[in-house]
Curated annotation (Swiss-Prot):
Biological source species: Homo sapiens (Human)
Broad class of the protein's primary localization: nucleus
Annotated Basic and acidic residues bias: 58-67
A Pfam family matched in the record: bZIP_1
Gene this protein is translated from: BATF3
Similarity comment: family membership: Belongs to the bZIP family.
Chain intervals for the UniProt region annotation (Basic motif): 37-62
Protein's UniProt name: Basic leucine zipper transcriptional factor ATF-like 3
Subcellular location: Nucleus
Record-level Gene Ontology MF annotations: DNA-binding transcription factor activity; DNA-binding transcription factor activity, RNA polymerase II-specific; DNA-binding transcription repressor activity, RNA polymerase II-specific; RNA polymerase II cis-regulatory region sequence-specific DNA binding; sequence-specific double-stranded DNA binding
């Protein structure tokens, strides 16, 4: 006889199940207490899942509100930066005009070399 082959009179029986079609164990008789416990567990699980989904939704809503608030604040701050930049430009121009005709700066007795100033606008603008 060759190895691995069944004897002539024996019959091999295999249960062939399609993939995904695992044979399901037959449910045993459950007592009413088991049924009640199962129903209570499912109800408790359902309530917990509902609570979790509600909490997740509330968290997302809160994050969205915070996002909107920060966007508004950001817009206000950008407007303020624009206004302050314009004010700085006007004041710088006024100072330059004043320096041209200021008698204290034009007096030869008060001749003090004034070092050139860096552009104040460039240092204030966001990069």
């Amino acid at each position: 006889m060759s190895q691995g082959l069944p004897a002539a009179g024996s019959v091999l029986q295999r249960s062939v199940a399609a993939p995904g079609n695992q044979p399901q164990p037959q449910p045993q008789q459950q007592s009413p207490e088991d049924d009640d416990r199962k129903v209570r567990r499912r109800e408790k699980n359902r309530v917990a899942a509902q609570r979790s989904r509600k909490k997740q939704t509330q968290k997302a809503d809160k994050l969205h509100e915070e996002y909107e608030s920060l966007e508004q604040e950001n817009t206000m701050l950008r407007r303020e930066i624009g206004k302050l930049t314009e004010e700085l430009k006007h004041l710088t121009e006024a100072l330059k005009e004043h320096e041209k005709m200021c008698p204290l700066l034009l007096c030869p007795m008060n001749f003090v070399p004034v070092p050139p100033r860096p552009d104040p606008v460039a240092g204030c603008l966001p990069r």
